Amino acid sequence: LETLILTPKKLYLAIKYHPDHANRPLIEALCAAFERCGWQSVVVARDLEGWGEKAFNPRDLMRESFRLIDTCAGLVVEISEKGVGVGIEAGYAHARGLPILTLLQPQADLPETLKGISTRVARYTLADLQGNVSAWLDHF
């Protein structure tokens, strides 16, 4: 039986994924900003799927996603582009009592349900991302 170890400074990034990895630069920019603040990140497309090298059926993907969330100290939701999986991951993290930082770009709509379970909501641009990440993560 595999033992899960909670890593105090590890975040799960919930974000809409694309088969062509069109938002990989955004994912990498977010993760780099977290890492500069001393936080490890877990990203399904990178860490489970190896940027398309490995595929999962939906049931196994969600099971593995939940397993990874259980090893993290918090969840960061990037909701500029909506996705059903993102909402499922956020709901799971909330049910587990994890803090949730919701990030979205200035033009994006914030779902009221996600706002209701978020520890903090912040709008950002890539230009101001690094300067704000440390303050946002103080809540974790």
Name the predicted role of every residue range.
Residues 1-140:
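Conserved catalytic or regulatory cores that recognize and/or transform ribose-phosphate-containing ligands
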